[in-house]
Swiss-Prot record:
This is Small ribosomal subunit protein uS9. Coiled coil: none annotated. Belongs to the universal ribosomal protein uS9 family. Keywords: Ribonucleoprotein, Ribosomal protein. It holds the Pfam family Ribosomal_S9. GO terms for cellular component: cytosolic small ribosomal subunit. The keyword Ribonucleoprotein applies. It comes from Saccharophagus degradans (strain 2-40 / ATCC 43961 / DSM 17024). The keyword Cell division does not apply. It comes from the Bacteria. One of its GO terms (biological process) is translation. InterPro entries: Ribosomal_Su5_D2-typ_SF, Ribosomal_uS9, Ribosomal_uS9_bac/plastid, Ribosomal_uS9_CS, Ribsml_uS5_D2-typ_fold_subgr.
């Protein structure tokens, strides 16, 4: 196995990502597939790449990711969060740059629960005055 490996856990909505960084040529593997195979939409791929592009480490690391739960954008956000944490484990000096971009903070927004008597979380049944 790799001599030097850095790890970060990322979460977003119901998705959890485990990100492993090893020094290499810039390969990104998500659940055994390449990034382009795993994420069909270009926007999701851009979200994943944001931290390494910001810190100019695109060709420096091989990234191996295991991600579970949620949808594609939730998973992309979880990978970005985990990748940010792994980069900070590699070099703590990157923290201010990543913090300024807003990648360090976990996005705590979750789906609001459906309430009894309502159609959705906040949508009410139609009101009839008479």
């Amino acid at each position: 196995m790799a001599a030097e490996q850095y790890y970060g856990t990322g979460r977003r909505k119901t998705s959890t990502a485990r990100v492993f960084l090893t020094l290499g040529g810039g390969k990104i593997t998500v659940n055994g597939k390449t990034l382009d195979e795993y994420f069909g939409r270009e926007v999701a791929r851009m979200i994943v790449r944001q931290p390494i592009e910001l810190t100019d480490n695109v060709e420096k690391f091989d990234i191996n990711v295991t991600v579970k739960g949620g949808g594609s954008f939730g998973q992309a956000g979880a990978i970005r969060h985990g990748l940010t944490r792994a980069l900070m484990a590699y070099d703590e000096a990157m923290r201010p740059t990543l913090r300024a971009a807003g990648y360090v903070t976990r996005d705590a927004r979750e789906v609001e629960r459906k309430k009894v008597g309502l159609r959705k979380a906040r949508k009410k049944p139609q009101f009839s005055k008479r």
